[in-house]
Every structure is written in structure tokens, then in C-alpha cells.
């Protein structure tokens, strides 16, 4: 159904148009995408004729600032936060609406000597400002176009146009596939672009390393920053990591209520302590503490989920009532930290099959699952049973 990201990059570099689809639970739409620097009048005309949507130009924050392209509105109420700037035409255009003149405006935007006074406002070209971090921060067509331009080694700007069917309704994936086949276009997804970037780019920075004596033993604490979202994570390392030998590893998601306050609603605190004890006894291992509170939904939303649980919902139902998946955690950043530490093979302390799959998917080998089941109590028994029944956690009752 979909093509490889590498194939799409090659086509874009040749000046061709591709189709980029987003997720079904987002806009569930496809856009024509091209490099801005290769947006000839023919490319623009193709998008207008067969896309039928609004032709926009995703650019960086730096370019928007340089050309004084202010936001179209002061208060953006769009559900997806699409960052339109004021629309523009190049100063030497006439009406600015033809494919030729829109192409002229786009090329003028990319001129390194361009200045704010070169453009009339409003106009017929609609710049969109991509978030820093690209699709890793916002999974939109705006960010995808700029990311793809960068991956092509081109100027970081694109041209996009929503694809609408002849009857005026939005083209969905099956329709988009037919269009791609008709015009021999590559078709990719933003989801695949996200995974491609996570595989190819280093997204963590090692910041500091100190010795940390604890009640469980002495560990080396190594702090990391996610360079995309700024979140800070820490690895507690015991002994020497030998890449070719399996390392005992626990990837533990932050749980303030359980880890710090000793909440009985979950088993997080006891799991954290048990993992540290086992690593200390082993004499070599890693506990990776990830800032993914509440299975990724954050502290306040976790407390909201607790409120719903008090009304009879289980932990999965509560997340879904709040509009979140049952488990929003991502293991790509954790995998990059483990690789930075020299871990390639691991004995993973977990009951969660998704964690095993997630880490394997980022090139790490899980040679053994080491169970980490804690005794249930009257406060968390339903929670644990729900994880067993609905999330597939490997638990025994």
C-alpha cells in the first residue's frame, strides 16, 4: 500500500510530487508534497488541477521571522494547530493567483537575500510554520514537508496541497492509492516518516554523569536530554557494560504517586525497588528511568484517570474516556539511551510484551524476559488484572 521513505526522498530530489498520508485518527487525509525549491509552475498547476485543495508552503520558524511573516490570527483555534502566517505574493506579480506567479512567489521566499518588503500582504501563497523538531513534535503535513526537504539536502521548505475528490469530498487512503497509481507517484505515511527519523537520527544528548549512593547500592547516574521535546531522563548504571554480553535492564516509566508517595493503586514503586535490588545483586545492569508519567499521559491526566477509576472504570477504560490510547509510551528514546550506554543485548526486567516489542523494534536484542511481578493488594488487584486481561501483561494470579 505504502512506499519506502527512501523512495519518496529520491523522487522529491528529482523534482517529482509525492503523496503523504496522515493517521486515520487525525485528519485521515493525503496531501501532494513537493520540494519548494523545485516547485515549478508545472508542479503548482498539477497540485491545483488534481489536488483541488489549498496550496501552502511549509517553512521554518527562522524564515518566518526573517521575512516578518506574522501569524494569520493571534489566537489559533484550529483543532490541529495549523500555523498559517499572513498570505503573500511576490512584489512583481500581478494578481498572484496563476500557477506561474505562485511559483514565482515561492522561489522568492527561498532567496537568501529576500526581505520582508519583497512581499505583498495578503496574497495567494499561504506559508505554514513548521514546529521545531518536525514530525517528532507534531505529526502534520507541515512538519512532514520540511522534514522531507531536510532529508533531501534541500532548502527546508515544501509545497503541499490537500487532495480532494472530483465530488468535493476528501480523498481517503484507498482513493489516494488510486491517484498515486494513476500518476505513478510514491505514497508514504507520516507515521513511517516518524519511525524513519527515529531510526536514523540521534535524538538524545548525554548531559552529566555522577556517582549516586542509594539504599540499594552505589550506581552511576547518567542524565540525558531528549533534544526534540526537552524531557530529561536518567540511567542508573551498575558495573561495566559489555556490548556483546546480555545486560540486566529495567526500563521504568516515571510514576510520582507510586515511586515517591508509595501509592497502593499500582505496583510501580515496588517494581522500581525490586529492579534496583536485582541489578545490585547481579553486579552489572541498567535501570533506565523515563519521564513517561501515567503510561505517557502525564501526571494531571493520570490523576483524572484515577478519578474515573473511582467511578468504576478500569485503567484502560479511564485512559480511553480521556481520549488517550491505553498505553501512550514510546520506547525509541529509551532504546537510543541504551545504545549510547553500550547495551546491545539485554535480559529485560518486565511483564509487558509491548515493551519487549518496542525495544526490539529499535535494534536491541532481548535475549531473556525476567519477570517482575509484585504481590497484589486490595487497592491494585483490579488494576493488575486489567493489565493482564486487556494489555496482555504476563502476570500470574
Curated annotation (Swiss-Prot):
Region GTP cyclohydrolase II: start-end pairs: 200-397
Binding locations of D-ribulose 5-phosphate: 26-27, 31, 138-142, 162
EC annotation from Swiss-Prot or TrEMBL: 4.1.99.12, 3.5.4.25
Keyword Manganese (UniProt): yes
Superkingdom of origin: Bacteria
Function according to Swiss-Prot or TrEMBL: Catalyzes the conversion of D-ribulose 5-phosphate to formate and 3,4-dihydroxy-2-butanone 4-phosphate.
Name by which UniProt lists this protein: Riboflavin biosynthesis protein RibBA
Organism of origin: Geobacillus sp. (strain WCH70)
